[in-house]
From Swiss-Prot:
This is Uperin-3.3. It comes from the Eukaryota. It is found in: Secreted. Pfam families: Antimicrobial_8. One of its GO terms (biological process) is defense response. One of its GO terms (cellular component) is extracellular region. Signal peptide: none annotated.
Length: 17
């Protein structure tokens, strides 16, 4: 769902930072 996609993006951002 949209929430899962948001969580996935958030995780990627954290990994990049």
């Amino acid at each position: 769902g949209v929430l899962d996609a948001f969580k996935k993006i958030a995780t990627v951002v954290k990994n990049l930072v």
